[in-house]
Structures are given as C-alpha cells and as structure tokens.
C-alpha cells in the first residue's frame, strides 16, 4: 500500500486500529488534515494569521478573503475559471472556451448553481471518482485545472485531487461468459486486495484454457485492444480521456508540451475470478479498502445470453447531449454502470432506449408507477423497431408472460421489492425475473427510492449493467452517495440553460403571481387553528380564483394549451367545475383520462384541463405551453421541477421572447409564500429566474370574472368553512413517489383513497419529507418542542 493510500487511513484518539475515513465535502477533508497535523505548512506560511485562521463568522458562511492566498496569473483574462482553496470552482460563461471548460468541470465536479453568467462547482470525492471512471487520469485533471484557472492552482486542491483519485477507478468488476472477474491494470492493487481474507476466500483459481497466467502472481493477463463500442444511432464511444482534454478549441491553453491523452490501446489488464455468490461481499470489502469497483459489461463478447433484435428506427434522431451522455457509458467496447441526469423533457427515455439498442440483450425497466410502465412501453415502440410480442409488462393489473428468449420487461420497484405473498401467476413471473441474467437494467427516477428498496431490487435481479435516469438527483439524507456504488457514478449531467439556448428545451417564463387575500378570507385564516383549513382558505382565495380565470382567458385567446395543477382535490373540482373545464385526479378511470387527454391534444375547443398531482410525471403532452399552479405539495422542490418539465419540450418559435409560461399563484401574506420560495430553489440553481407579479395588468377591467362581488366571495367563504377537515388535505396516491419512499403501504379499506393526513413536523410542511429519503425515523431532537415564550404559554393555558 502506497504512502498516498495510507493517508486515507487515520488513527483516531488512542485507538490502535485503523479505520477507513471517507469525506463528503472538501471542508471535511481539510478539517481532518488540520486535526491530524498533516495540513500543508508551506501554504499556511504564505498567509497571515487573519487569512489562515477562519473566524467564527467566516465558518458560518460569510465571505472568505483569498486575496492573500491566491495569486492571479498575468494572462488571467483569457482563462475561464477560478479555483479556490476550499475546492469551489467558479466558471465564467462569457469565456471563449466556456463550452470546453464546462464539459470538463461537469466531468470532475458537482454543479452547485448555474445561473446565466457565473457557474459554481464543488470538487468532491465522488465527483472525482466519477471522473476517473470515465477515463480521466489524476495528472490530467490537475494539469487542465491549472491551465484553465486564473489563479495558481492551490496546493490543497492538488493534494485533494491526488488523494481522491489514486485508488478510484483502478479496480473493475467484469462479467464475461457468465463469470465474474476483478480486473485492474495495476497488479499491485490486486495483490493488496487479496490480502483481505474475504476477497481471498472468494477467489477462484484460474485454468489454463485460453488465458495467460502470470506465474508469480497467478493473475490472468489479457491484452486489451481498445476499439470502442458502436452506439446505436451512429455514435462512436470514447474509450479513454474526456474529449475536452483533446479538443482543439482549448487553443494555446491546452496545447503545451505535455501530452493530454494516454494511449490505452496496448495496455495489459490483470484479473482474478471470484465466486458469483460472493460478489456483493467483494464489492463491500473493496469499498471499505478504498478501492471501489467499477462495473463494466463486455456485451459484444457475451455469447451466453441471447441477443435481442432491437435497433433505433431510421427516423430516430439522437441529440448531441444524448450522444455525449451515452459516450460516458460506453467505452473500451464495454458498458459501464452509472447515472445520467437530464432535465425533464430532454429525452431521458430515448437515452435509455438507445442504451438498450446498443447492448442488445434482455432489458429490465424499473419504474415508479403503473402509468410510467405504459409510458415506457409506448416510448420503446415509438423510437425502436422492437416487436410487440417482445415487450412484457408486470404490474398489479397486467402480468404478461416474459419472452422465453431475449425481451424487454417493464415493471415497478414495488412489484419487484414486494416481500409478501404473491399469486401463482405473479410468483411465476417474479421467478423468471430473479433467475434471468439481464443485460441491462434501466432505473427510471433513480433518486426517489430509499436505499433499502434499492438494495433489495438490485439483490433479487442479476444484471450485467445498470443505468439510472433522473432529472433531479436530490437527497438530503446522504443516501444519494450510496448510488455511486449501488448503481455507479454519475456519468453525465446536462445544463438546463445551455439546452434551452440550443433550442432543445422551451424558453420558459417563470412567474410568481401574488394574490392578496380578501379581508373576510384573511380574517378566518388568522383565527383558524387547523392547518388543513388554513390551506383550504389560501387555496380558495377568491383573488387567486380570479387570477386563474384571467390567465386562462388571456392564454386561450393566444391559442395556448393550458394545464392547471392543484394538489388539493376540493379546490381542483371547485375550480374546474366553476370554469367549466375537464379535470383529472386519482379516481379518474384510465379510459376517461385517455379521452380527456386526447381531446386536449387534438380538439381545438379544449384548451384547458385541470390535473391533480397524478400529472406531475405520468403525462406526456408536448402541446402544453402554459402551466398554472394553484395548489402544491408544500415546499417540494422536486415537484416544482417536474411540473415545469411538463412544458419544457421544444416548442415552435413565437414572436415574443418566450414560448412557454409557468405561473405559480400564491396567496399573499400566508404560509404559501414561504413554501413557494423554497420550491423554487432547485430551479433557481439551474439558472431559472422567477419574476414576481404583484398585480396582473388589466384584471380589474376584465368583466364577468367569478367571485368579483362581495356577496359571491362571502358565499364561497361559507362553503369553504362548511367543509370538513379532509377537504384541506392534499391528494396522496397509492403510487405516489413519496409513498414509495415511505414503504408504499396500501390502505386496507376497499374505498378509493384520494387524500389522507400525514404526521410529521414543520420540516415536513416545508418540503422536508420530499427531500429526506430515510430508512429510519428522524432523531427525537427534531420532534422536540422548543421552549416557549411565557406569553405563548399563558395564551395556551387560557385556551384550555
């Protein structure tokens, strides 16, 4: 084990044993270095006490002064990035080499915020792990960072990159001819791993059939001839370094004497075979030894599993960013497991289908709901030449026989992970799924399932390659990092604004419309203690209703197609029936849904439909150009992005600046304003801006708007106050994403459940439940009641 390797093993306190230490952020790493006394002293000597030692206010997030620690290069104006000692990187989007620099940073760092002019990235161990997984070498990362940076590359950053990349990506788990091999170009790494008793026990001694065995180590030696995998659709996958290192557009910055590429075409790989039953244990031990394995599939040389006759249709066109994402997946003639992050409406499904057409083996698609299963089947038939008989669905309502040879099976996470008793028909299909050797598993919305569900799904299915697809790779319980090893590293993440500028996404105007509460409604809002009734009052605010009707009239006159979203079923029905429009929610039958959507798409007289949260992810209506949101799921950032995605698909160019419109109607001076601000955060980080409309121009002159008179408003208030507590609750579906994260427990009642109350704290109301995907209950500290002021204690006592 090298000295660099040993730096990752820290002795703590008086403990005599060593424990593996991983870092979630660069700050954690730096703090650990300082504690251990290994921080680079030469760097500290170049700064005075005030700049080297952060004050308490700086540690809490105040501005940091690096002026005395960082020296600008003379030609800094021609270089696009700022590399800070804390691992943050800032990119100027107006640079002449922005595109190449952006591609490089996406490969090595995590995007934090990407507005119009300056992008922020953060170096993390996992982002660097992903970088080496697609072929980048340690020295290449450091060299290119140094050349692109306006500042001399901080020594702390260089040391961090070396620490994180020296072991990542050097060990691969390959499935060849139905045998598992641990493979590496570094025999000393394999020797180190075999010193572990668990890995040594799992090893299978090689045979001298077609392999060359090193007599000293006993490793199998293969001479790799790298040709690259031909991706369906004509793309040749890159097999070594990221193209940014070889791009001529980097001009003089990257055209120096040092070579930027490494020729791997004549490289020898060493490997040893392991017992298939002990693969999970080997992966676990490799992670603990700081050598996480990459999983790659030599699909072209797989003669054991039958080929699937599937190709993209000649009319199917792959976009450049989809090609780029797939080039990260296919290299060295193999398919590597990982995650692709693309915006809503940018063609995640087509990327997955293209991967399936490239591998040409049995495909398993895992979705979040039965509606998504139908969508995936439609997408396979739309983009590929696969035959109907080769596609099978496995849901609670459709249990179709799986093809005896190769085929595509589409099911849900809950169907595969279900641990209870099954029907004979379901059990037979499930046995086929667990016993088959799948070439590729596509995991749709890969971020929504908790770690326990992931491990079970991935344990019961045997797959050569796994590809996760998502638009919002968000988790706040740190479980998102587990995906690096359960699925694989993040292979690619697209920039929303760049795709919008290129015409691949609609140019959306995002607005927050403030709707003042009427005096009568606001009075009831203030004096009512029921959270459900408060929510119903600000949702049914007459001024919000009038704003919604006004916007519908305005955009219908323009010829737009409008979707109005409401999580609250009572409000959904009240709005839709009051305005004479079709509506869809949980209990709406499948036939009626398809009928309404068909009319919306093809009937010019049907320009507006109302939809509950069933439409967040399960509809595909390219014709929609306007979203109006009257009720939402508290502070869910994910839902905001998903709803925006309903209108992100490319639109015909319009005379104005925007060709799509997103309105969020918010009752002024209520909790809804706080939730709205929280919901927008993810989209703001992607570069979108929300303008506030405090008053819709012309709304007071619009005639015949409902609830314009005082008497109509009082009648509506009486109806709202007369409703029960359940009317103020949001619709929560049996197949809701959040149900999946909570275990998807179904109600035993035979009656259809369209809404229910969920227990929790104020963190849940602010969107915490959407973002905290946890396997366990939150610590008691989060549920404790804070100390109350004496005034409020007395008030509570008086109420009793």
From Swiss-Prot:
Gene Ontology terms, MF aspect: 3'-5' DNA helicase activity; ATP binding; ATP hydrolysis activity; DNA binding
Keywords, comma-separated and alphabetical: ATP-binding, DNA damage, DNA repair, DNA-binding, Helicase, Hydrolase, Isomerase, Nucleotide-binding, Nucleus, Transcription, Transcription regulation
Region of interest (Disordered), residue spans: 1-27, 743-769
Ranges spanned by the short sequence motif DEVH box, renumbered to the chain: 444-447
Protein origin, superkingdom: Eukaryota
Sequence ranges assigned to domain Helicase ATP-binding in this UniProt record: 329-491
Domain Helicase C-terminal, first and last residues per copy: 546-704
Localisation per UniProt entry: Nucleus
Induction, per UniProt: Up-regulated in a dose dependent manner following exposure to both UV light and cisplatin. Unaffected by exposure to hydrogen peroxide.
Comp. bias (Polar residues): 17-27, 749-764
GO biological process, one term: nucleotide-excision repair
Residues annotated as binding ATP: 342-349
Enzyme class: isomerase
Principal location listed in the UniProt entry: nucleus
Oligomeric and partner information: Component of the 7-subunit TFIIH core complex composed of XPB/repB, XPD/repD, gtf2h1, gtf2h2, gtf2h3, gtf2h4 and gtf2h5, which is active in NER. The core complex associates with the 3-subunit CDK-activating kinase (CAK) module composed of cycH/cyclin H, cdk7 and mnat1 to form the 10-subunit holoenzyme (holo-TFIIH) active in transcription.
Biological role stated in the UniProt entry: ATP-dependent 3'-5' DNA helicase/translocase; binds dsDNA rather than ssDNA, unzipping it in a translocase rather than classical helicase activity. Component of the general transcription and DNA repair factor IIH (TFIIH) core complex. When complexed to CDK-activating kinase (CAK), involved in RNA transcription by RNA polymerase II. The ATPase activity of XPB/ERCC3, but not its helicase activity, is required for DNA opening; it may wrap around the damaged DNA wedging it open, causing localized melting and twisting that allows XPD/ERCC2 helicase to anchor.
Name of the protein: General transcription and DNA repair factor IIH helicase/translocase subunit XPB
């Amino acid at each position: 084990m090298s000295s660099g390797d040993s730096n990752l093993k820290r002795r703590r306190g008086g403990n005599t044993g060593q424990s593996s230490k991983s870092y979630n952020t660069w700050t954690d790493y730096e703090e650990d270095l300082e504690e251990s006394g290994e921080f680079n002293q030469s760097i500290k000597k170049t700064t005075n006490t005030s700049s080297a030692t952060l004050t308490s206010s700086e540690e809490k997030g105040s501005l940091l002064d690096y002026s005395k620690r960082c020296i600008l290069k003379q030609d800094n104006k021609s270089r696009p990035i700022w590399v800070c000692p804390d691992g943050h990187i800032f990119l100027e989007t107006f640079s002449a080499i922005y595109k190449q620099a952006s591609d490089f940073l996406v490969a090595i760092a995590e995007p934090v915020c990407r507005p119009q002019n300056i992008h922020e990235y953060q170096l993390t161990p996992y982002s660097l792990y992903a970088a080496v997984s697609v072929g980048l070498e340690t020295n290449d990362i450091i060299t290119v960072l140094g050349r692109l940076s306006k500042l001399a590359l901080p020594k702390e950053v260089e040391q961090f990159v070396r620490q994180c990349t020296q072991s990542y990506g050097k060990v691969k788990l390959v499935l060849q001819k139905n045998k598992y091999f641990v493979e590496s170009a570094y025999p000393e790494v394999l020797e180190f791993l075999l010193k572990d008793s668990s890995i040594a026990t799992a090893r299978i001694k090689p045979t001298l059939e077609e392999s060359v065995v090193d007599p000293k180590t006993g490793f199998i030696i293969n001479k790799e001839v790298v040709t690259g995998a031909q991706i369906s659709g004509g793309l040749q996958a890159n097999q070594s370094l990221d193209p940014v290192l070889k791009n001529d557009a980097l001009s003089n910055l990257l055209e120096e004497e040092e070579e930027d590429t490494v020729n791997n075409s004549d490289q020898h790989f060493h490997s040893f075979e392991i017992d298939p039953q002990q693969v999970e244990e080997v992966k676990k031990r490799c992670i603990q030894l700081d050598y996480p394995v990459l999983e790659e599939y030599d699909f072209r040389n797989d003669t054991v599993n039958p080929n699937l006759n599937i190709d993209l249709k000649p009319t199917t066109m792959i976009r450049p960013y989809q090609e780029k994402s797939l080039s990260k997946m296919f290299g060295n003639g193999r398919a590597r497991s990982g995650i692709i992050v693309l915006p809503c409406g940018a063609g995640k499904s087509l990327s997955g289908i293209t991967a399936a057409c490239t591998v040409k083996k049995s495909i398993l698609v895992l979705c979040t709901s039965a509606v998504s299963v139908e969508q995936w089947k439609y997408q396979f038939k739309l983009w590929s030449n696969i035959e109907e008989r080769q596609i099978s669905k496995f849901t609670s309502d459709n249990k179709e026989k799986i093809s005896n040879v190769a085929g595509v099976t589409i099911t849900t996470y809950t169907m595969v992970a279900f641990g209870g008793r099954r029907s004979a028909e379901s059990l037979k299909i499930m046995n086929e799924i667990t016993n088959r050797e799948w070439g590729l598993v596509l995991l749709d919305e890969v971020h929504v399932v908790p770690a326990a569900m992931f491990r079970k799904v991935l344990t019961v299915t045997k797959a050569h390659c796994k590809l996760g697809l998502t638009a919002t790779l968000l988790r706040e319980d740190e479980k998102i990092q587990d995906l690096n090893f359960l699925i694989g590293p993040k292979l690619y993440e697209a920039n929303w604004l760049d795709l919008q500028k290129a015409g691949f996404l609609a140019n959306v105007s995002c607005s927050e419309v403030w709707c003042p509460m009427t005096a009568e409604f606001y009075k009831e809002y203030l004096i009512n203690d029921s959270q459900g009734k408060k929510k119903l009052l600000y949702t049914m605010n007459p001024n919000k209703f009038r704003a919604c009707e006004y916007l519908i009239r305005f955009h219908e006159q323009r010829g737009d197609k409008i979707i109005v979203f409401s999580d609250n079923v009572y409000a959904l029905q009240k709005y839709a029936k009051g305005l004479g429009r079709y509506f869809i929610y949980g209990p709406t039958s499948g036939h009626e849904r398809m009928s309404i959507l068909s009319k919306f798409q093809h009937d010019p007289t049907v320009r507006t439909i109302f939809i509950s949260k069933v439409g967040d992810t399960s509809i595909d209506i390219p014709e929609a150009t306007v979203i109006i949101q009257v009720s939402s799921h508290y502070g869910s950032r994910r839902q905001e992005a998903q709803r925006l995605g309903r209108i992100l698909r490319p639109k015909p160019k319009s005379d104005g600046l925007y060709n799509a419109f997103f309105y969020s109607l918010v009752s002024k001076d209520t909790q809804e304003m706080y939730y709205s601000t929280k919901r927008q955060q993810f989209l703001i980080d992607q570069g979108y801006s929300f303008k506030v409309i405090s008053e819709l121009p012309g709304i007071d002159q619009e005639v015949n708007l409902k609830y314009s008179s005082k008497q109509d408003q009082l009648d509506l208030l009486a109806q709202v106050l007369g409703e029960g507590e359940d009317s103020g609750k949001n619709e929560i579906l049996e197949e809701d994403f959040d149900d999946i994260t909570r275990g998807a427990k179904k109600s035993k009642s035979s009656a259809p459940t369209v809404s229910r109350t969920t227990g929790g704290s104020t963190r849940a109301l602010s969107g915490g439940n959407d973002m905290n995907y946890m396997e366990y209950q939150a610590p008691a500290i989060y549920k404790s009641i804070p100390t109350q002021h004496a005034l409020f204690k007395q008030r509570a006592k008086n109420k009793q």
